């Protein structure tokens, strides 16, 4: 027998997802959504939804009068599993020390690698669970989590196991990415390490939960050809390619992503309109991470070149993510939406789409409707104490998430009928 899990009704604005044509939001005034057996069963005007799914019959009924209801945020780029504390590096950066100089001195990624290697399995699971808790409280219901702080086969596999263990017990839907090629360990050179990733790490990682293989394609890290080798090998093991590309320099990672038909290319601070066109032609989702530029005091990526390149093409024009990591310590997609509008001058509707439906495409989840509220999609529903989606960027620095439902079950907040 079907179960009416939840009815959220009376929303001043209900955000469904991309409108017909895909380039703007479909919204309803006085909107409602009903969730049955974990999936959206009805969405539309409150009177129509309540006539078919009375609130008094629901396990959870939420009166969203005066509020905005939208799909749960999708965060397509995080390094949420880590150990240790690098807040002292934050202070050094404020004094003007470049991140690459910190990395060269054994800080940055390599410092976190040492902490992760020293952490117990239980500590890794607990650390990730704590990060997911905060993400969920800020409205994220689907999140990618990368490895990459192991840099050896044993620790990378321990990270994969920890991600799987935390994900199995958490309401956030976790998508796992193998990132063995996150940095070059200080006891080897890049070519030798690439061989180790291909020969040792990838065969072991293929037995775990990873869906994607990512590489940090950047000057003084991994070249385009080294990245290609790793991603080709990952694909042979069933892992779809992703890239960190054009973050500090324009090295050619975006074009590589296009050549490979990668699922996404991420960062892209130094990408050009030609790169944007190549990604759009290849159906690669660009993932912009404005919080990283914010904390590093770098110029923001230009979303308009990606939006323009995507015109009249299929696929998501652009996505947004937090890049949650010890160097960019934010869990809030709402904050990222605000940065996208106030820093990168995105329209609020575009920013909300880039944090929901378009972000799902960066995880190859767009086809199943993740990041939308349509009949048959997962019942991941966000209730925000604001009169419209515009207030997400308009009111920065405030977590106005009032309730989060995952598969129709209250995970954060709630309220009465």
From Swiss-Prot:
GO molecular function terms listed in the Swiss-Prot or TrEMBL record: imidazolonepropionase activity; iron ion binding; zinc ion binding
The record's free-text note on cofactor binding: Binds 1 zinc or iron ion per subunit.
Binding site for 4-imidazolone-5-propanoate: 86, 149, 182, 247
Residues that bind Fe(3+): 77, 79, 244, 323
EC class: hydrolase
SUPFAM superfamilies cross-referenced by the UniProt entry: Composite domain of metallo-dependent hydrolases (SSF51338), Metallo-dependent hydrolases (SSF51556)
Binding sites annotated in the UniProt record for Zn(2+): 77, 79, 244, 323
Subcellular location: Cytoplasm
Catalysis performed (reactions): 4-imidazolone-5-propanoate + H2O = N-formimidoyl-L-glutamate
Residues annotated for N-formimidoyl-L-glutamate binding in this entry: 149, 325
GO BP, one annotated term: L-histidine catabolic process
Enzyme Commission number, as recorded: 3.5.2.7
Alphabetized Pfam families for the sequence: Amidohydro_1
Record key words, sorted: Cytoplasm, Histidine metabolism, Hydrolase, Iron, Metal-binding, Zinc
Any single Gene Ontology cellular-component annotation: cytoplasm
UniProt pathway annotation: Amino-acid degradation; L-histidine degradation into L-glutamate; N-formimidoyl-L-glutamate from L-histidine: step 3/3
InterPro entries assigned to the protein according to its UniProt record, in alphabetical order: Amidohydro-rel, HutI, Metal-dep_hydrolase_composite, Metal_Hydrolase
NCBIfam families per record: hutI
UniProt record similarity statement: Belongs to the metallo-dependent hydrolases superfamily. HutI family.
Role of this protein: Catalyzes the hydrolytic cleavage of the carbon-nitrogen bond in imidazolone-5-propanoate to yield N-formimidoyl-L-glutamate. It is the third step in the universal histidine degradation pathway.
Protein name per its UniProtKB record: Imidazolonepropionase
The organism's taxonomic lineage, starting at the top: Archaea, Methanobacteriati, Methanobacteriota, Stenosarchaea group, Halobacteria
């Amino acid at each position: 027998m079907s179960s009416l899990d939840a009815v959220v009704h009376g929303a001043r604005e209900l955000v469904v997802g991309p409108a017909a044509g895909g380039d703007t939001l479909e919204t309803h005034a006085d909107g409602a959504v009903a969730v049955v057996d974990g999936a959206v069963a009805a969405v539309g005007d409150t009177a129509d939804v309540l006539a078919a799914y009375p609130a008094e019959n629901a396990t959870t009924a939420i009166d969203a009068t005066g509020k905005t209801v939208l799909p749960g945020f999708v965060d397509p780029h995080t390094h949420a599993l880590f150990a240790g504390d690098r807040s002292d590096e934050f202070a050094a950066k404020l004094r003007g020390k470049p991140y690459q100089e910190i990395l060269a001195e054994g800080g940055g990624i390599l410092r976190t690698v040492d902490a992760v290697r020293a952490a117990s399995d239980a500590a890794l699971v607990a650390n990730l669970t704590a990060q997911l808790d905060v993400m969920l409280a800020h409205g994220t219901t689907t999140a990618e989590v990368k490895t990459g702080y192991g840099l050896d086969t044993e620790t990378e596999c321990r990270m994969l196991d920890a991600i799987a263990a935390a994900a199995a017990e958490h309401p956030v839907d976790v998508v796992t990415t193998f990132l063995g090629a996150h940095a070059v360990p200080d006891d080897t050179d890049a070519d030798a390490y690439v061989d180790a990733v291909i020969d040792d790490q990838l065969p072991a990682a293929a037995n775990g939960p990873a869906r994607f293989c990512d590489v940090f394609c950047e000057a003084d890290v991994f070249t385009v050809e080294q990245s290609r080798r790793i991603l080709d090998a990952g694909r042979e093991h069933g892992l779809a390619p992703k890239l960190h590309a054009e973050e500090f320099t324009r090295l050619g990672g975006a074009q590589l992503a296009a050549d490979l038909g990668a699922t996404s290319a991420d960062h892209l601070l130094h990408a050009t309109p030609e790169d944007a066109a190549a990604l759009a032609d290849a159906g690669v989702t660009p993932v912009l991470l404005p919080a990283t530029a914010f904390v590093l005091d770098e110029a923001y990526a230009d979303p308009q070149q990606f939006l323009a390149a995507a015109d009249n093409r299929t696929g998501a024009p652009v996505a947004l993510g937090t890049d949650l990591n010890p160097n960019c310590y934010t869990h809030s997609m709402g904050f990222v939406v605000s940065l996208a509008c106030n820093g990168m001058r995105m329209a609020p509707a575009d920013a909300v789409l880039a944090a929901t439906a378009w972000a799902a495409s960066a995880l190859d989840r767009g086809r199943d409707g993740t990041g939308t509220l349509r009949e048959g999609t997962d019942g991941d529903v966000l209730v925000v104490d604001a009169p419209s989606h515009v207030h997400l960027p308009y009111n920065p620095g405030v977590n106005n998430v009032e309730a989060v439902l995952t598969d129709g079950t209250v995970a954060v907040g709630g309220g009465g009928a």
